[in-house]
C-alpha cells in the first residue's frame, strides 16, 4: 500500500516529528512524507520517501504566509507547491492520503489542499482514502461556531477517517471542539504519538561528552528557534552567577530556524561550560 502523508509545520518542529513517527510506524507500506516547512536534518526509515515542498511559514501573529526563500514571492511558491502536489498524486496514485491537522487547522494552506481534495473526491487519482491526523488540543478560534461548522462540512465531504493523537482517558477532542458528537466519520484515538527514547543512550552520551557522574547536565532547547530568544539569553546571563558553576554543563540548542544575528549574540555569551548549537538529531539521547 502507498501512503502520502502531508505535514506543514509553520513555526516549530513538533508537527514534523509526530508525522515522522506516524510514517515510521507504517513500516509495511511505502510512505511519501511531504514536508512543507524549512528543511530539518532528520533520519528517515528505508520505507519513507521525503518530498520537501518549497518552504512557507507563518509570521509571529499567525496571520500572514511568508516564503522561506526571501527572493521568491509567496504567489510563486504557492504555484510551485500546487504543481508538485498534483504531479505527486498523478505519479503515485496512493491508497491513502493522510493530512496533518487540516481541516481543523492550516486553513491558510487551503490554496493547495482544497483543489487536491476536490480532485480526489472526483476520483481523478483513483480510489483514495483520506485521513485527518489531528493533535490532542485545538487552538480556540475567534468565530468558533463558524469554524466548527466548516470543519464538520469538510470532514463529511472529503474525509474517511479522523485519527486523534491523544489518550481518550486523559484528554478527549470534545474539550476543545464542541461538536464532536456531530462527526459522522469514524474517529480513532491513537494515544500520544512521540519518539521513543533509548533507555541506555543517555549514559552513553554522557561518556561521549566526558561528563562525570558528579557533574550535572542541563539541556536547554528553544525548539525550532523562531521564538525563545529571551529565555536562552537569560540562561546565558544567569550561568556565571550560579554557585558551583564548574560542576554544571549546559548543552543549549537554539533551534535550526534561529536567525543568524540572534545566534551570534547568544554565541558571544556562551562561556566555558556551555556549548551552543542550532540542533541535534540526538535530542532524546540528551534528555534520557
Summary of predicted features, one role per range:
Residues 45-56, 182-193, 270-277:
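Active-site regions of enzymes building and remodeling cell-envelope glycoconjugates
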Residues 134-229, 255-260:
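A nucleotide-sugar donor-handling region in carbohydrate enzymes
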Residues 39-47, 174-183, 260-270, 285-287:
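Short loop/helix-cap segments at secondary-structure boundaries that form the rim of catalytic
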Residues 29, 124-129, 159, 185, ...:
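A short helix->loop->beta-strand "cap" motif at the edges of active sites that frequently abuts
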Residues 23, 195-288:
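Donor-nucleotide binding loops and adjacent catalytic segments primarily
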Residues 5-20, 228-230:
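A short, glycine/small-residue-rich beta-strand->loop->alpha-helix junction that serves as a flexible
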